[in-house]
Amino acid sequence: DAVMDVMLPSLREERAQSYSPFLPLHPKTNRVMQVSIDEVNRSRGSIIWTDPETGERFESPVTGGHCKLQWKPDWAMRWVALGVDYEMAGKDLIDSVKLSSEIARTLSGEPPEGFNYELFLDEKGQKISKSKGNGLTIDEWLTYATPESLSLFMYQKPREAKRLYFDIIPRMADDYLTFREKYPQQA
């Protein structure tokens, strides 16, 4: 109930009508079911739901691997259960971090310290997207340059958006070698 009290105000009205932090796994197919919950049985720690294809009703315990959590409550639960004390997230997830932090406190836990970073952009300044294929993978970078050059790229100005594209690799590799060469003279 406490998690629902945090989640419901963040949802559109239509979504709030059917929302549950728990997604039951179908006992016959093991599929994650995105269904409305018909009833909550707190004494047994279970939810009752109806298979939309067959009309069959099931009661699923919310523990023991019988349910999956929706991602925002899941994030908070992991923080609390695993004692996570530091979490990085892209700026596009700031609101989700705040919501998950509130859920963690509701569960008598402490949310982790955080760091929000800017997103990566392609050479045209557009947000990198896996589906568009306009990005560069770590493996691709490491095919052409060292892990240290990648670290230099990642840790320079972490709160600024970075353009990540192939032509940046040689520049970062050269910059790393230059910094490494000059370090003894500056130390």
Predicted segments with their positions:
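Active-site cores that bind ATP or allylic diphosphates and position pyrophosphate for catalysis
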Residues: 2-138
